[in-house]
Amino acid sequence: MENIIKIENLYFQYPQGEDEEPKPAIKGVNLEIEEGSFTAIIGQNGSGKSTLAKNLNGLLLPSRGAVYVSGMDTRDDEKIWDIRQMAGMVFQNPDNQLVSAIVEDDVAFGPENIGIDPVEIRARVDEALDAVKMGKYKRKAPHLLSGGQKQRIAIAGVVAIRPRCIIFDEPTAMLDPRGRKDIMEIIEKLHREGITVILITHFMDEAVRADRVVIMNKGEILLDGTPEHVFSQDELIKSARLDVPMAAEIAIYLRENGIDVPQDVVTAERLKEFVCQYR
């Protein structure tokens, strides 16, 4: 598969006062995202993960280096709307993404702004709302919905544009456990349907569902690999002030005590399977 996103020696620095010492939020990051993949990017607050996310579709532009989306440079003003149509983004707070008084109008907002035919917009809105199981709410006012329902509407608004990639910037951070579960099921469904998913999160149980995990620390990539590889590096992860998933921590403890636990035991489901099969 080809890369949909390519990051080359990316540095990003927020504007600072005259007396402040320059401190890049992103420092020399190189990363390639394969089309159709599911990548989780995790890190503590201040690690640079959300800043990186906003550089992926031109919401922020590199201070140095470059970001390419399907070969298009995010610094190219003439390509920026093509880039954002290809790489959509869902934010942590859905209230910041909802713009209309009626759900179906909100979902239609993106397609309308890229000049889609009205008949096609209607089909896309219905399809996107069905994809997030919110079809029966299309005539409701978004402000009357729960946080999880609002986030589903925000996702539907991005899906209606039909991007090849969706960047989720901590989409479950403001939700209760049930809401988190529902949103993760939608994200996994979109990935199965062929959309490239980039998930920014600080929840380890979400990160283990990805094909690939990237750990950010102090603006740099600390670890990059499969969940099995990354979450076996428990000391390095803890040095970045992150927790290892509980299942992975139990697996590490069992290995240290002489039990041959497979390296792919990083989720509760996989740990349960191993325990049931162990003799």
Please place each PLM-identified region on the residue numbering.
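Helix-to-loop junction immediately C-terminal to a conserved catalytic motif
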Residues: N57
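Conserved ABC ATPase signature
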Residues: A141-L145, Q149
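Catalytic Walker B motif of ABC-type/P-loop ATPase nucleotide-binding domains
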Residues: I166-D169
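Conserved ABC ATPase "signature" region
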Residues: V119-Y137
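Conserved ABC transporter NBD signature motif
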Residues: G65-R75, I83
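The feature captures the beta-strand-to-loop junction immediately N-terminal to the Walker
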Residues: I42-Q44
